[in-house]
A protein has these predicted regions:
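Glycine/proline-enriched, intrinsically flexible loops and inter-domain linkers
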Residues: 1-90, 98-117, 121-580
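Glycine-rich phosphate-binding loop of nucleotide-binding enzymes
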Residues: 93
Length: 580
């Protein structure tokens, strides 16, 4: 075999990513549920046949899933090896959602399929899709007051859902007997399997063209280069230990904050992440399983060094000490529905807060840091059927050294977007009375945070139950280097004309609603970066003109005094205000 040349290596790198991209798009375009088809709450990747380590991921999937899936794939491989799982055959697809076996929360359902070359497994393809319901005590699975994982839904160890390409009717029946709106899941299941089959076909085309040995050599070289590049980036960071803290509002059961304490030690070309001092395992659903904790650290560093190609090699210089005895290393039966969408973002926030001290030009202030999980389940009398609606929302990104934060961006753990209002109103008996930018929510700074989202949903028909598992309701996203925090999450429910604010601010379950009742949500703005008094006064004037801040906020937050109805800057008054 000829030595692998640079051009072939580059072509194969792009080809492997393209396989994953096509799997992502197939999954979304064929899926039934809006959360997958419209919001893209899914991901696909290619994983090592030896240990499940990440080979490639698509650019269209949730990055946190791809990092996690290397652990769930590894678990499938290990359970097959020790006889706890039936051995694979061509065409088999395993299903698993057990959080403690390399997962996230129960709603994130993983499929894993071996790709054979002859009689040997060449690699594994795996994907994750967020199912709108997985059973449990409340529609949507976000049980804010759950104290055990069984209350959150059906937990599946790795089992064959497809055998030699055929859906197993018995396993399918067990699943359907334990979830809501089960008749709608077959569309998502078929889409999830189809994505893997497309990936298998495209990967076999690459292997047939270039040869198995060449592709294996390319995979090894890409992993080596990713590790080398990450090490080079780390080596440029000043040696030392950087400390930070981030806070979870509450666990949904005990109304007290949870602390993420982080020390990042940089030595040579490695970073060591130590969460010693973080809160102990909690009673409610804001525990994080180890796979999610690890993936959250990796993803945060991916934000800081986006130039590093993503593969298992990129993670090698990142050493995460296992946070045993804390809520970041959940063990059965701790509930975990808040881990993937909320706690993972607090972990990333802690990483950002530590690393901005070392790399102020590369790291932003804290982003919104909440996926805005809002689940609504009920019966639509006009259609004569039950439904489960799942709404996720964007928020403001943190400001950085050169720019203001992005407004209404997706969460930092992925690329999920809010489903279009028109799709939600068509699919469910709801009306969006208001859907707009949340003015004033961005944290003040030399570069302000981006703004969150404000929306209000009215129930049009029938009875329903609402549940929320969000975060940043008590603490807004942190500012950096003198910047101010962004505005926190806000949830208000109007029942029979009476206003109700959840005691845990961003978490509650099973709130009964009737036609005419409304839910109002305001998502967080991003943290500000740098001293607000150093912000260009002309930018403050522009923000006021656009309606982002009031004239009063311009003076209070930025020290900019406006005159003539907010149309011009009073330079002398501004100088006095900023001088204190």
């Amino acid at each position: 075999m000829a030595k692998l040349d640079t051009i072939t290596l580059s072509v194969l790198q792009a080809a492997l990513q393209q396989v994953c991209d096509e799997m992502d798009l197939t999954f979304s375009r064929a899926a039934f549920s809006p959360v997958i088809a419209e919001a893209n709450d899914r991901s696909d990747g290619i994983y090592s046949a030896l240990d499940g380590s990440l080979i490639a991921q698509g650019s269209q999937g949730l990055p946190v899933f791809v990092g996690v899936m290397q652990y769930s794939t590894k678990t499938v491989i290990e359970m097959i090896a020790d006889g706890r799982c039936l051995p694979p055959e061509p065409g088999d697809i395993y299903i698993v959602n057990d959080p403690y076996l390399g997962g996230t929360h129960l709603m994130d359902v993983r499929f894993a399929m071996p790709v054979y070359r002859g009689e040997k497994i060449f690699c594994w393809l795996s994907n994750t899709g967020h199912w709108p319901d997985i059973g449990g005590s409340v529609p949507g699975g976000f049980s804010a007051s759950a104290t055990a994982v069984e209350q959150e839904g059906l937990r599946l160890p790795p089992v064959k859902l497809f055998k030699k390409g055929v859906l197993d009717p018995e396993i399918y029946a067990i699943i359907c007997s334990n979830i809501r709106v089960a008749d709608q899941r077959i569309g998502d299941i078929r889409a999830q399997a189809a994505a893997l089959l497309i990936g298998q076909d495209r990967l076999n085309g690459i292997l047939d063209r270039y040869g198995d040995e060449t592709v294996v050599e390319a995979i090894a070289e890409l992993r080596r280069r990713a590790a080398e590049q990450m090490r080079a980036n780390i080596a440029a960071i000043p040696d030392g230990t950087y400390h930070s803290k981030a806070f979870v509002d509450s666990d949904g059961v005990v109304n007290e904050p949870l602390t993420i304490a982080l020390a990042v030690e940089k030595q040579g070309d490695t970073l060591t992440f130590d969460f010693t001092g973080s809160s102990r395992p909690c009673a409610g659903p804001m525990n994080s399983v180890l796979a999610t904790t690890l993936s959250s650290v990796y993803l945060a560093m991916r934000h800081i060094f986006p130039d590093v190609p993503i593969s298992a090699g990129a993670f090698e210089p990142l050493i995460v000490k296992r946070p045993e005895g804390t809520f970041l290393d959940a063990k059965y039966p701790r509930p975990v529905s808040g881990c993937a969408a909320e706690v993972s973002q607090r972990i990333a926030e802690a990483v950002f807060a530590a690393m901005v001290q070392a790399l102020p030009d590369k790291v932003t202030a804290a982003p919104a840091g909440s996926s805005g999980n809002f689940a609504l389940g009920g019966n639509d009398p006009a259609r004569g059927r039950d439904y489960v609606m799942y709404q996720i929302s964007g928020g403001g990104y943190g400001g950085n050294s050169g720019h203001d934060g992005l407004t209404n961006g997706c969460s930092t753990i992925g690329i999920s977007k809010s489903p279009p209002v028109e799709i939600m109103e068509q699919a469910f008996p709801v009306l969006y009375r208001h859907y707009a930018l949340r003015e004033g929510s961005g944290g003040a700074g030399k570069h302000r945070g981006g703004f969150g989202l404000a929306y209000e949903v009215e129930i049009l028909r029938g009875d329903a139950r609402a549940s929320f598992v969000m975060d940043h309701g008590r603490f807004g996203p942190q500012g950096a280097l003198g910047g101010k925090d962004g505005e926190p999450n806000s949830v208000t429910v109007f029942r029979g004309g009476v206003e109700h604010v959840p005691p845990h601010l961003s978490k509650e379950q099973d709130i009964p609603l009737k036609a005419g009742d409304r839910v109002r949500v305001g998502t967080p703005g991003g943290g500000g970066y740098g001293d607000p008094l150093e912000r260009d006064a002309n930018l403050v004037l522009r923000d006021v003109a656009l309606g982002y801040y009031t004239s009063e906020e311009a003076s209070e937050k930025f020290g900019v005094v406006l005159s003539a109805g907010g149309l011009t800057i009073d330079r002398k008054a501004t100088d006095r205000q900023r001088a204190g």
